[in-house]
Amino acid sequence: MFWKENLQLIMNFEDFDQAYEWFTPRHDPMPFPKMTKAQLRNAVKLFKEDQGARIAYVAEYLSSTSGKDFPTLDDLEQLLRLGRKSMDRTGPEFDDISGTFFSLANDFAFCLCAFLQKYRDDVDWVASKTSKKSGAYNRPLIARPNYETSKGYIDGLQFFLNSLRSSVRREETVDEVMDELKFAIKRNFDIDLS
């Protein structure tokens, strides 16, 4: 049974939200594109340092049944479902003013990075070196070595934020967002999850 019927429809989301400890990034509080290269490299360094502890918290908090295999594809889906539930409270134009949505985006990105590292040991957080024309310019990316402007990386934070916003506007399901994620993973990392 998938996570006990989706954690009894996300464990009554308000109960989840009250107990969930937000992730607070330790990097400078400014948008990534406005950071200097040194500031972005520091943000990436801090993400790498924080990933293990945050993944352990998420696995325990969500009572994942995947055990030492956490995070699995089902775990990533669960985080997307929580993000969607969070967004449904306010609508895509407002995001989630509580901060839960943005914390879940970070947790999703950490878990996505760890998930990909199980398949490829050359995947890690990197400071973007894509061009200014790229939507991933000057951002922390989950990437393989020698990635290109258009291929070889995923912006885990932006994937979570943009895909869920778009899914609400287009009235798509989380299952469809998962299909997008699998496609992006196959295209960028040559990992077939179908």
Label each residue range with its predicted role.
Residues 1-98, 187-194:
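The feature captures two recurrent sequence modes
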Residues 81-84, 113, 117, 165:
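Alpha-helical repeat scaffolds in large eukaryotic proteins
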Residues 98-148:
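Amphipathic, interaction-prone secondary-structure segments
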Residues 47, 58-62, 125, 142, ...:
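Generic hydrophobic, helix-prone segments enriched in Leu/Val/Ile
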Residues 15, 40, 118, 152-153:
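Short linear sequence motifs
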Residues 130-194:
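A recognition module on extended beta-rich or small alphabeta surfaces enriched in W/G with H and D/E
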